[in-house]
A protein has these predicted regions:
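Transmembrane alpha-helices and adjacent helix-loop boundaries
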Residues: 1-431
Length: 431
């Protein structure tokens, strides 16, 4: 049946098929994401009647699905009819006005992102918090892989270092080294992650390509084995983990809810994104790009490969250490099984899907690969199937990623031109 409907949509004119497709997507979103939509509608006196119209206690009503289909189809139809006029009117505006309008939309989006969790409830706050942690780690790995070209499959080790140092410095348990506040423990955790990142990079300085992936994978596993070992158990608690880690507090107000911790993660992500953006445009960022493209040429140009690589590992680890620090206070406890290899793979996957070297791509990749599976927990067993399909689809349809950087777009375009020129040359030779 679905195949017949799909074939029918393809045969219909675009002006008809697009509203129908949009309506179906709108109705599907209303049903699949009801855990997100229902609390927002039900918690307000103004929107409560709309909630009762669309939903019942067991889910989306039939009339709700029809209403969502018609409303979404109408919006798509209206947009298709008016888009040329809107684009023409926008094009007639002077560049200054266009820039102000764009910044107005960006400001509105930021305000919605800030205010949305307050009304969405703790479940959505927890999902956004998880996405935020992966955004932080994604920005760190993006420095290593996307900009410097250093494939790191042991990245989760830095995440673990940040979490464990925070736990050891804050926990109210026999394993605590001190009883610091979060604001005292967090910078120390980040610094320790940087140190471990630099030490991590020393053995793999001369390793390239696939061998680098295997080497970093092994080093990451070494950290996990050390945490689980009997020798480190008196300090790190082994498999029992570190318990009773208190929540951070600001002026006597404890950040105890997922929404409050999300705002902490949001602030950390904004600061980290600014730092990463400035790094990318700096002399160090250009040196990273040079060694990514060709290490031998970069060295011939006078770039110190050792210093530049170690800085990439150390600064990338700082982002993971910050995420690990927040993760420790989010759970209130730390266990070794929380830091598995699959986390490194997830971070690498979201960078590939979002776009190598792109900060907005990291956010989009985390939203798609981390946020959507969290929202659709009834399909949780298919999470890794979804990851695989998403990566294959991106590689086939948008090899540069969903939101690539300008440099990556240029590289893809140049590669395509080179391949086309080579194909034309071969055709001429055969002729």
């Amino acid at each position: 049946v679905l195949g017949c409907l799909g074939a029918l949509l393809v045969m219909l004119p675009r002006r008809i098929s697009r509203p129908l497709t949009g309506g179906a997507i709108g109705a599907g979103i209303a049903g699949l994401f009801q855990e997100l939509i229902r609390p927002i509608l039900a918690n307000s006196v103004v929107t409560k009647p709309l909630h009762d119209l669309l939903y019942t206690w067991s889910g989306l009503k039939l009339q709700g699905a029809v209403i969502m289909f018609l409303v979404t189809a109408g919006i798509v139809l209206a947009w298709d009819m008016n888009r040329p006029r809107v684009a023409a009117a926008f094009g007639r505006l002077d560049p200054g006005t266009q820039r102000r309008i764009r910044w107005g939309y960006i400001t509105l989006a930021v305000l919605l992102a800030v205010l949305f969790p307050m009304y969405a409830g703790n479940f959505i706050g927890q999902v956004l918090l998880t996405v935020g942690l992966f955004v932080l780690m994604g920005m760190g790995l993006n420095l290593e892989v996307g900009i410097a070209g250093l494939l790191d499959l042991g990245f989760v080790a830095f995440y673990a270092v940040g979490a464990y140092v925070t736990g050891l410095l804050m926990a109210d348990s026999p394993f605590a080294l001190a009883h610091l506040s979060y604001w005292q423990a967090m910078p120390i955790a980040v610094l320790c992650s940087v140190i471990v990142g630099v030490l991590f990079g020393v053995p793999v300085l001369k390793v390239r390509g696939d061998y680098l992936a295997v080497a970093t994978l092994g080093l990451g596993e070494i950290v996990r084995v050390i945490v689980l070992s009997d020798a480190a158990a008196p300090l790190l608690a082994g498999a029992k983990g570190i318990l009773q880690i208190p929540r951070p507090a600001i002026g006597g107000f404890e950040l105890a809810t997922p929404v409050a911790l999300f705002y902490l993660t949001l602030v950390a992500s904004v600061v980290a994104a600014y730092f990463a953006w400035r790094l990318e445009d700096s002399r160090l960022g250009r040196a990273w790009m040079a060694i990514r493209d060709d290490e031998d040429v970069a060295q011939a140009l006078g770039i110190n490969l050792i210093n530049v690589k170690l800085l990439a590992y150390g600064l990338g680890a700082a982002f993971a250490g910050l995420a690990g620090s927040i993760f420790a206070v989010m759970l209130g406890s730390i266990y070794p099984h929380s830091f598995q290899l699959i986390i490194s793979i997830n971070i690498l996957a979201l960078i590939i899907v979002g776009g190598m070297g792109s900060l907005p791509g990291v956010v989009l990749g985390a939203a798609v690969l981390i946020g959507l599976p969290e929202m659709l927990r009834e399909f949780g067993e298919f999470r890794y199937l979804f990851y695989g399909l998403a990566i294959i689809a991106v590689m086939r349809l948008k090899p540069e990623g969903l939101w690539p950087s300008a440099a990556r777009r240029r590289e893809i375009a140049l590669d395509a031109e080179t391949v086309a020129a080579q194909a034309a040359s071969v055709s001429e030779q055969k002729a």
